[in-house]
Structures are given as C-alpha cells and as structure tokens.
C-alpha cells in the first residue's frame, strides 16, 4: 500500500511539474501615457479657442510591432515577446503626445489625428520618429521630426527633437517610464511652437 501511495504521489508531482513547464510566460503590457493628472483635467475643462490634431505618427519598420524592442549591442536588438505595448507603438506615442500637449495648452482641443474630433482641427502635427532605442538597466533615447501645419497645408514650424533618459533599475517598467519622460519633453517643445503660432479657431471653418 505504501509503495502504491508513493508511486501515486510521484506521478502527481511529475504531472504538476510538466504542467508548470508547459505554461507560457505571462505577457505584460505597458503604456507610454501616464495616468491623467490635474493638469490634464484642467485642460479638458477649459473652453477651447482652437484645435490641434497630433498625427500621423510614423515609426521605423523595425519598431512597428507590439513587442518592446531593446538594444543588445551596436548591431543587435532583442524583440521581447512577453513585454508588449498596450496598443501599437504609433498609437502609444501619439496618445502620450496628445496628453502632454493638451495639458500644456488648456485653451486648445488636442486629439489624435485619426479621431472624429480631429477632422476640423486648425493645426496638424506630424511626427516622424527616427530613433526609439532602449538599453536595459541603462537608458532610452529618442529622435523625431515634428512638423506643424495649418488646415490648409501651410507649414508653420518644424524641428528635430532628441533626448535621452536614464532608466536605472526596474527593468521594463523603468524603460516605459523613461520613454514617457522623453515624450513629455517633446510635448513641451511642440506646445511652445503652437503658442507662437497665430490663433486659428476651428469654429470658424
């Protein structure tokens, strides 16, 4: 009887180990836009005098994927299957910029270019991401071209934004947070350029 019980117990242990080995690693999802704060709420409650559409956002083909990509050397990158963006990288960057620019321009309605609200936008901000690099436990860096146009296509301003942020410890959460800080800086640059632009009311279109 004891031998039978031992064999049965061993079989259960083996089955449990096999089940554990067969379980796929858990996927984790990250966002580049922080939770809405007081500044964003204040911007949303103000009466808009003009409107801004953020987008389109273009990213390099190698990064246009749901997985987080980290650099492993000068010529090698790793695609992390279990570390993923909550949406497409383009939409995550766009949403972070919508939130960041909107928080800094309380008198403007800021929305994503593909949204219904953006159809009558007085200004459009195109983003062309040239670099979006991360090194685990080190830093992230971005470089992007931005261009502001009026609704008639006339270019008002453009520039190239470059920034890097240390990640420190914290692995992938720290990478997402550092990217968020770089995009917050870019939001400030774009907002400053929009403040200098002549005010065009979307209501009069």
Feature locations, PLM:
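Amphipathic beta-strand/beta-sheet edge segments enriched in Tyr/Trp
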Residues: 135-165
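Post-signal peptide N-terminal segment of mature Sec-exported envelope proteins
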Residues: 29-53
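A short, hydrophobic beta-strand-centered structural micro-motif
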Residues: 52-55, 115-135
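Short secondary-structure boundary motifs at beta->alpha junctions and helix caps
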Residues: 76-84, 153-192
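N-terminal segment of the mature soluble domain
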Residues: 49-117
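Bacterial signal peptide processing site
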Residues: 22-25
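Bacterial N-terminal signal peptides that target proteins for export
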Residues: 1-10
């Amino acid at each position: 009887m004891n031998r039978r019980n031992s064999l049965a117990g061993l079989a259960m242990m083996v089955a449990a180990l096999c089940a554990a080995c067969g379980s796929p690693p858990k996927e984790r999802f990250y966002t580049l836009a922080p939770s809405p704060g007081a500044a964003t709420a204040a911007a949303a409650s103000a009466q808009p005098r003009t409107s801004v559409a953020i987008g389109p956002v273009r990213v390099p083909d190698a990064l246009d994927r749901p997985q987080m990509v980290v650099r492993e050397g000068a010529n090698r990158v790793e695609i992390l299957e279990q570390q993923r963006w909550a949406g497409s990288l383009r939409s995550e960057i766009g949403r972070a910029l919508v939130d960041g620019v909107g928080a800094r321009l309380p008198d403007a309605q800021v929305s994503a270019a593909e949204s219904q609200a953006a159809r009558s936008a007085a200004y459009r901000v195109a983003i062309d991401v040239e670099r979006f690099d991360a090194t685990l436990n080190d830093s992230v860096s971005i470089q992007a071209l931005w261009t502001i146009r009026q609704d008639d296509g006339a270019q008002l301003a453009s520039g190239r934004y470059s920034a890097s942020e240390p990640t420190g410890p914290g692995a992938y959460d720290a990478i997402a947070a550092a990217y968020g800080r770089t995009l917050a800086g870019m939001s400030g640059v774009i907002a400053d350029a929009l403040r200098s632009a002549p005010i065009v009311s979307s209501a009069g279109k």
